[in-house]
C-alpha cells in the first residue's frame, strides 16, 4: 500500500490541474488508491435517480478524489504550500515540520 503524505483534516493546496491554487481541508484519504478528497476542490456533477431518501432526484454536485501527488500541505504561518520534514522527539513521538519556516504542522 502506497504511503500518503497528508492526513484527514490537513489544510492542503492543489498544485496541478483545473483547481490549481485552491486551498481546502482533506475530507477523506484513500491510501489503497493513493487519492484524497479535498473540501471544495474537483467538484463533479452526478445525475441521481429519485430514491426514498432523496425523492427529488436531479443533478448533485460533490467532491471527487484527486491523486495525492497533486496536493501539498499548506503552512498557515508562512502562508505557502510546503514540503515537510519529519522529526522524532525524545519521547518517541513524530512531528511534521514545515521546510520553509520550521513551524510544527499539526
From Swiss-Prot:
One of its GO terms (molecular function) is rRNA binding. One of its GO terms (biological process) is translation. Transmembrane segments: none annotated. NCBIfam families: rplX_bact (TIGR01079). Belongs to the universal ribosomal protein uL24 family. Part of the 50S ribosomal subunit. This is Large ribosomal subunit protein uL24.
Amino acid at each position: 500500500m502506497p504511503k500518503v503524505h497528508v492526513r484527514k483534516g490537513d489544510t492542503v493546496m492543489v498544485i496541478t490541474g483545473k483547481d490549481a491554487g485552491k486551498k481546502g481541508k482533506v475530507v477523506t484519504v484513500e491510501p489503497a488508491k493513493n487519492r484524497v478528497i479535498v473540501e471544495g476542490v474537483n467538484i463533479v456533477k452526478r445525475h441521481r435517480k429519485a430514491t426514498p431518501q432523496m425523492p427529488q432526484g436531479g443533478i448533485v454536485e460533490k467532491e471527487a478524489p484527486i491523486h495525492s501527488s497533486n496536493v501539498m500541505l499548506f503552512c498557515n504561518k508562512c502562508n505557502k504550500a510546503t514540503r515537510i520534514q519529519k522529526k522524532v522527539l525524545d519521547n518517541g513521538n513524530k512531528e511534521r515540520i514545515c521546510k520553509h519556516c520550521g513551524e510544527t504542522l499539526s
